[in-house]
Amino acid sequence: MKVNERGIFMKNHQININSQKCIGCQMCIKDCPAKNIELQQTKASIIDNECIMCGHCVAICPKNAVSISGYDEEPILKQSNYQLNPEDVLNTIRFRRTIRQFQKKDINQDILENILEAGRLTHTAKNAQDVTLIVLDKEKDKLEKMAVSLFKKIKPIDNLISSMAKRNEITDYFFFFEAPKVILVASKDHINAALAAQNMEFVAEAYGLGVLYSGFFTMAANHSRQIKKQLDLPKGQKLVTALVMGYPKVQYQRSAPREKSNIKYM
Protein backbone atom coordinates (compact mmCIF):
# COMPACT_ATOMS: atom_id res chain seq x y z
CA MET A 1 0.00 0.00 0.00
CA LYS A 2 1.42 3.36 -1.01
CA VAL A 3 0.21 6.65 0.46
CA ASN A 4 1.63 10.00 -0.57
CA GLU A 5 2.33 12.91 1.80
CA ARG A 6 -1.27 14.15 1.49
CA GLY A 7 -2.63 10.82 2.67
CA ILE A 8 -4.08 9.79 -0.67
CA PHE A 9 -4.66 6.08 -1.03
CA MET A 10 -2.76 5.00 -4.16
CA LYS A 11 -2.56 1.20 -3.83
CA ASN A 12 0.34 0.62 -6.19
CA HIS A 13 -1.25 2.30 -9.20
CA GLN A 14 1.04 3.53 -11.95
CA ILE A 15 0.32 5.71 -14.97
CA ASN A 16 1.62 4.40 -18.30
CA ILE A 17 1.69 6.21 -21.66
CA ASN A 18 2.08 4.16 -24.84
CA SER A 19 4.44 6.24 -26.98
CA GLN A 20 3.39 4.31 -30.10
CA LYS A 21 -0.22 5.45 -29.67
CA CYS A 22 0.48 8.97 -28.35
CA ILE A 23 0.07 11.69 -31.00
CA GLY A 24 1.37 14.53 -28.83
CA CYS A 25 -1.95 16.41 -28.81
CA GLN A 26 -1.27 17.59 -25.23
CA MET A 27 -4.89 17.14 -24.14
CA CYS A 28 -3.77 15.13 -21.11
CA ILE A 29 -1.16 17.77 -20.22
CA LYS A 30 -3.71 20.60 -20.25
CA ASP A 31 -6.27 18.63 -18.22
CA CYS A 32 -3.97 17.16 -15.54
CA PRO A 33 -4.83 18.78 -12.15
CA ALA A 34 -1.47 17.68 -10.71
CA LYS A 35 0.52 19.17 -13.63
CA ASN A 36 2.26 15.81 -13.74
CA ILE A 37 2.56 15.34 -17.52
CA GLU A 38 4.99 17.03 -19.88
CA LEU A 39 5.87 16.81 -23.56
CA GLN A 40 9.14 15.09 -24.38
CA GLN A 41 10.16 14.78 -28.03
CA THR A 42 6.55 15.29 -29.21
CA LYS A 43 5.20 12.61 -26.82
CA ALA A 44 3.40 12.95 -23.49
CA SER A 45 5.49 11.74 -20.56
CA ILE A 46 4.73 11.28 -16.84
CA ILE A 47 6.95 13.40 -14.56
CA ASP A 48 6.58 11.12 -11.52
CA ASN A 49 4.03 8.82 -9.88
CA GLU A 50 3.10 11.24 -7.09
CA CYS A 51 -0.38 12.30 -8.16
CA ILE A 52 -3.97 11.63 -7.11
CA MET A 53 -4.57 9.05 -9.87
CA CYS A 54 -7.79 10.80 -10.90
CA GLY A 55 -7.69 9.14 -14.33
CA HIS A 56 -8.46 12.28 -16.34
CA CYS A 57 -5.49 11.52 -18.60
CA VAL A 58 -6.97 8.08 -19.31
CA ALA A 59 -10.45 9.46 -19.95
CA ILE A 60 -9.47 12.35 -22.24
CA CYS A 61 -6.93 10.65 -24.53
CA PRO A 62 -8.37 10.35 -28.07
CA LYS A 63 -6.04 7.45 -28.91
CA ASN A 64 -6.39 5.36 -25.71
CA ALA A 65 -2.65 5.79 -25.12
CA VAL A 66 -2.85 6.26 -21.34
CA SER A 67 -3.55 3.57 -18.77
CA ILE A 68 -3.34 3.14 -14.99
CA SER A 69 -2.20 -0.20 -13.58
CA GLY A 70 -3.69 -1.99 -10.60
CA TYR A 71 -7.39 -1.95 -11.49
CA ASP A 72 -9.55 -5.01 -12.15
CA GLU A 73 -11.55 -3.39 -14.94
CA GLU A 74 -10.84 -1.58 -18.18
CA PRO A 75 -12.20 1.94 -18.76
CA ILE A 76 -15.51 1.98 -20.65
CA LEU A 77 -15.54 3.77 -24.00
CA LYS A 78 -18.21 6.46 -24.24
CA GLN A 79 -20.17 5.33 -27.30
CA SER A 80 -22.32 8.41 -27.76
CA ASN A 81 -23.19 11.69 -26.15
CA TYR A 82 -26.10 11.61 -23.74
CA GLN A 83 -27.80 14.34 -21.80
CA LEU A 84 -30.18 14.25 -18.86
CA ASN A 85 -33.41 16.18 -19.26
CA PRO A 86 -33.05 19.05 -16.75
CA GLU A 87 -36.80 19.18 -16.02
CA ASP A 88 -36.92 15.43 -15.34
CA VAL A 89 -34.01 15.71 -12.91
CA LEU A 90 -35.61 18.68 -11.15
CA ASN A 91 -38.94 16.83 -10.89
CA THR A 92 -37.18 13.81 -9.41
CA ILE A 93 -35.93 16.11 -6.65
CA ARG A 94 -39.22 18.01 -6.39
CA PHE A 95 -41.43 14.94 -5.91
CA ARG A 96 -38.98 12.90 -3.89
CA ARG A 97 -40.34 12.08 -0.42
CA THR A 98 -38.80 10.29 2.53
CA ILE A 99 -40.42 6.85 2.70
CA ARG A 100 -41.44 5.28 6.01
CA GLN A 101 -43.99 2.77 4.69
CA PHE A 102 -42.54 -0.08 2.64
CA GLN A 103 -43.99 -3.02 0.73
CA LYS A 104 -43.01 -6.50 1.86
CA LYS A 105 -41.05 -7.00 -1.34
CA ASP A 106 -37.32 -7.62 -1.57
CA ILE A 107 -34.92 -5.79 -3.87
CA ASN A 108 -33.51 -7.77 -6.79
CA GLN A 109 -29.77 -8.39 -6.44
CA ASP A 110 -28.98 -6.91 -9.87
CA ILE A 111 -30.81 -3.71 -8.92
CA LEU A 112 -29.02 -3.58 -5.58
CA GLU A 113 -25.63 -3.99 -7.27
CA ASN A 114 -26.38 -1.13 -9.69
CA ILE A 115 -27.28 1.10 -6.74
CA LEU A 116 -24.01 0.17 -5.03
CA GLU A 117 -22.16 0.83 -8.30
CA ALA A 118 -23.43 4.41 -8.18
CA GLY A 119 -21.81 4.74 -4.77
CA ARG A 120 -18.55 3.23 -5.99
CA LEU A 121 -18.32 5.53 -9.01
CA THR A 122 -19.02 8.71 -7.05
CA HIS A 123 -16.28 11.34 -7.14
CA THR A 124 -14.33 11.92 -3.93
CA ALA A 125 -12.13 14.81 -2.81
CA LYS A 126 -8.53 14.30 -3.98
CA ASN A 127 -9.69 10.97 -5.48
CA ALA A 128 -9.48 9.43 -2.01
CA GLN A 129 -11.98 6.66 -2.88
CA ASP A 130 -12.42 6.28 0.86
CA VAL A 131 -16.12 5.40 1.12
CA THR A 132 -17.19 2.11 2.71
CA LEU A 133 -20.61 0.64 1.88
CA ILE A 134 -22.24 -1.96 4.12
CA VAL A 135 -25.45 -3.69 3.02
CA LEU A 136 -27.60 -4.77 5.95
CA ASP A 137 -29.53 -7.90 5.06
CA LYS A 138 -29.29 -10.91 7.38
CA GLU A 139 -27.85 -8.81 10.23
CA LYS A 140 -30.32 -5.94 9.76
CA ASP A 141 -32.78 -6.97 12.48
CA LYS A 142 -29.98 -7.74 14.94
CA LEU A 143 -28.39 -4.29 14.53
CA GLU A 144 -31.75 -2.56 14.69
CA LYS A 145 -32.49 -4.35 17.95
CA MET A 146 -29.21 -3.03 19.41
CA ALA A 147 -30.10 0.51 18.35
CA VAL A 148 -33.63 0.19 19.76
CA SER A 149 -32.22 -0.94 23.10
CA LEU A 150 -29.97 2.14 23.24
CA PHE A 151 -32.74 4.58 22.31
CA LYS A 152 -35.16 3.15 24.86
CA LYS A 153 -32.63 4.06 27.54
CA ILE A 154 -32.35 7.69 26.43
CA LYS A 155 -36.00 8.30 25.46
CA PRO A 156 -37.10 9.39 28.98
CA ILE A 157 -34.56 12.23 28.74
CA ASP A 158 -35.82 13.28 25.29
CA ASN A 159 -39.41 13.24 26.58
CA LEU A 160 -38.51 16.02 29.01
CA ILE A 161 -37.38 18.40 26.26
CA SER A 162 -39.47 17.44 23.22
CA SER A 163 -43.22 16.95 22.84
CA MET A 164 -42.58 15.19 19.52
CA ALA A 165 -40.38 12.65 21.31
CA LYS A 166 -43.27 11.92 23.68
CA ARG A 167 -45.53 11.08 20.74
CA ASN A 168 -43.05 8.66 19.16
CA GLU A 169 -42.90 5.16 20.53
CA ILE A 170 -39.60 3.28 20.19
CA THR A 171 -40.91 0.14 18.47
CA ASP A 172 -38.92 -2.86 17.23
CA TYR A 173 -38.90 -1.25 13.75
CA PHE A 174 -38.26 2.34 14.83
CA PHE A 175 -35.14 2.75 12.65
CA PHE A 176 -35.69 0.67 9.50
CA PHE A 177 -39.51 0.53 9.21
CA GLU A 178 -39.39 -3.11 8.02
CA ALA A 179 -37.61 -2.10 4.80
CA PRO A 180 -35.90 -5.01 3.01
CA LYS A 181 -32.43 -3.44 2.74
CA VAL A 182 -30.30 -0.80 4.42
CA ILE A 183 -27.06 0.59 2.98
CA LEU A 184 -24.68 2.11 5.51
CA VAL A 185 -22.25 4.72 4.17
CA ALA A 186 -19.02 5.40 6.06
CA SER A 187 -15.94 7.50 5.39
CA LYS A 188 -13.35 9.74 7.02
CA ASP A 189 -14.81 12.55 4.93
CA HIS A 190 -18.51 13.33 5.48
CA ILE A 191 -18.89 15.02 2.09
CA ASN A 192 -17.51 12.01 0.21
CA ALA A 193 -19.99 9.74 1.98
CA ALA A 194 -22.90 12.13 1.44
CA LEU A 195 -22.19 12.41 -2.29
CA ALA A 196 -22.12 8.62 -2.62
CA ALA A 197 -25.38 8.33 -0.70
CA GLN A 198 -27.10 10.91 -2.90
CA ASN A 199 -25.99 9.18 -6.11
CA MET A 200 -27.21 5.82 -4.81
CA GLU A 201 -30.56 7.39 -3.97
CA PHE A 202 -30.92 8.74 -7.52
CA VAL A 203 -30.39 5.26 -8.98
CA ALA A 204 -32.76 3.76 -6.39
CA GLU A 205 -35.42 6.32 -7.39
CA ALA A 206 -34.93 5.36 -11.05
CA TYR A 207 -35.83 1.77 -10.10
CA GLY A 208 -38.99 2.89 -8.31
CA LEU A 209 -37.54 2.49 -4.82
CA GLY A 210 -38.01 4.83 -1.89
CA VAL A 211 -35.36 5.90 0.60
CA LEU A 212 -35.18 7.13 4.17
CA TYR A 213 -31.97 8.60 5.56
CA SER A 214 -31.94 7.24 9.11
CA GLY A 215 -30.17 9.87 11.16
CA PHE A 216 -31.37 8.14 14.32
CA PHE A 217 -29.63 4.87 13.43
CA THR A 218 -26.49 6.78 12.42
CA MET A 219 -26.51 8.45 15.82
CA ALA A 220 -27.04 5.15 17.62
CA ALA A 221 -24.32 3.37 15.64
CA ASN A 222 -21.74 6.05 16.36
CA HIS A 223 -22.48 5.93 20.10
CA SER A 224 -22.81 2.17 20.57
CA ARG A 225 -19.67 0.11 21.11
CA GLN A 226 -21.68 -3.00 20.27
CA ILE A 227 -22.78 -1.70 16.89
CA LYS A 228 -19.33 -0.28 16.09
CA LYS A 229 -17.82 -3.69 16.79
CA GLN A 230 -20.32 -5.40 14.50
CA LEU A 231 -19.72 -2.95 11.64
CA ASP A 232 -15.92 -3.22 11.92
CA LEU A 233 -15.25 -0.07 9.88
CA PRO A 234 -11.76 0.74 8.55
CA LYS A 235 -9.63 2.74 10.99
CA GLY A 236 -10.54 6.42 11.06
CA GLN A 237 -13.87 5.98 9.28
CA LYS A 238 -17.20 6.92 10.82
CA LEU A 239 -20.75 6.04 9.84
CA VAL A 240 -22.13 9.10 8.04
CA THR A 241 -25.58 7.97 6.96
CA ALA A 242 -27.89 4.98 6.55
CA LEU A 243 -30.09 4.55 3.46
CA VAL A 244 -33.20 2.61 4.43
CA MET A 245 -34.51 1.30 1.12
CA GLY A 246 -37.49 -0.52 -0.36
CA TYR A 247 -40.58 -0.26 -2.55
CA PRO A 248 -42.97 2.42 -1.25
CA LYS A 249 -46.34 1.34 0.08
CA VAL A 250 -47.75 4.84 -0.52
CA GLN A 251 -47.89 7.15 -3.52
CA TYR A 252 -47.67 10.92 -3.02
CA GLN A 253 -49.92 13.07 -5.20
CA ARG A 254 -48.05 16.35 -5.22
CA SER A 255 -44.92 18.14 -4.07
CA ALA A 256 -44.53 19.42 -0.51
CA PRO A 257 -44.14 23.14 0.26
CA ARG A 258 -40.67 24.50 0.87
CA GLU A 259 -39.32 27.82 2.10
CA LYS A 260 -37.62 30.13 -0.39
CA SER A 261 -33.87 29.64 -0.65
CA ASN A 262 -31.46 32.04 0.96
CA ILE A 263 -29.51 32.88 -2.19
CA LYS A 264 -27.00 35.69 -2.61
CA TYR A 265 -25.28 36.76 -5.83
CA MET A 266 -21.92 38.47 -5.38
Segments and roles (model prediction):
Residues K2-M266:
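Acidic, surface-exposed loops and disordered segments
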